[in-house]
Amino acid sequence: MKRILIYITFSVITVVAAGQKPEYYLMKGKALIESGKPGDAAALMTEALKEKQDATFYLLRAEAFLAKGDYSSAIDDFNSANKLIPSSGEYGLARIYAIRNDAPTAVYHLELSMRSAFRKSEKEILTDPSFSLLENRPEWRQFWKKEWYTTPEKSMAEIEYNISTGNLAEAGNIFRTLSSAYPEDVNTAYSSALVSVSESKYSDAVKMLAQTLAEFPDNEKCLRLLASAQEASGNPAGASLSYTRLIELNVPDPELLIRRAGCYSKTGETEKAVDDIETYLGFYPESKKALSLAGKAASASGDNIRALSYFSENVRLHPNDPECFIDRANSYFMSRSWEWAARDYGMSLDLQPGNSEAWLNKGISLVNLGKTEDACFNFRKAFNLGNRNSTEYLSRYCIK
């Protein structure tokens, strides 16, 4: 497993030279920054820039320099991004000058960003810790006195907030007002789909979003919501296509790979699922979630040896997590390796004794090892924890 992960990491780092898709090394760069390795992220983007002068590479390298505290280099890269795509680096420049407590310059660049296609939402700006030093500055107060957002944008933000807090009735009221006043606005269409999803009307949401994306094919928010609605409606094939569209838009979000892998697993495209997960593991080699998903995908395809390699790596990395032992125990259980299954269920129960399913499966494993008395102890534990499936085994093996 270690050899696999080393190869994956190496192949992602050298992806530029191999001429593969840029979204994967953008994801890698983001992962390196998140993992506290901004220097490695900057080096990766430097290699990318040798192959192609792309604004997204400059922007990500600027973020890496910012994370290192190298503000001068970050400013240079944000300005380089601006030269390739006007205004693309203005928000980053605003953040740097805010961190430096230079309110006039920070607000100047923020206003340039707000007048461009790269404008951030009010929530994004207000929750960005970079601007915390400006909160009591007059320039900051003056900035927020201006009308930066349209009525549909404000209404959409209110709808998002009310849905997030469970106030669906108020979200519906705001949407009805919005739709009557601005029926053709893209924010109205998105809000309509958002309300439909909150009401579990997934087909309505999918229909609305498909119509909107026909006109605005690169709208990231709509694509993300479409993928979620497709998954919720039981259409993993459609969702995988939506996640692919997001990835091909160079959205530097590694979680898209995990979401797409989950869809591939549901459609039986196991190799595609494992490919996505292994790419993700190249970014986050110790991810419990990814190792678990990779093992389950391999197990579903009938490759138990491959599954066990992932599950064992997860146990090694996360020895105090009961779910890692359960994953491996389930794999042993499916392959009828009863002794190993019983051992791993036992390890999980040492960490989480309230898992009735683990008690039941450990009991079944022990029965198959001929240890009926020990098995009955486990069946009773499962029953006492509310597992009704244990009654069949209790009556068959334990009641004389």
Regions found by a protein language model. Name each.
Residues 22-23, 55-56, 87-90, 121, ...:
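Helix-start (N-cap) detector for alpha-helical repeat units in TPR-like alpha-solenoids
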Residues 47-48, 80-81, 113, 177-178, ...:
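Canonical positions in the second alpha-helix
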Residues 50-51, 82-84, 116, 181, ...:
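Structural marker of alpha-solenoid helical repeat scaffolds
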Residues 60, 92, 126-128, 191, ...:
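Canonical tetratricopeptide repeat
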Residues 125-161, 368-400:
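Terminal, low-structured helical/coil segments at or just beyond the last alpha-helical repeat
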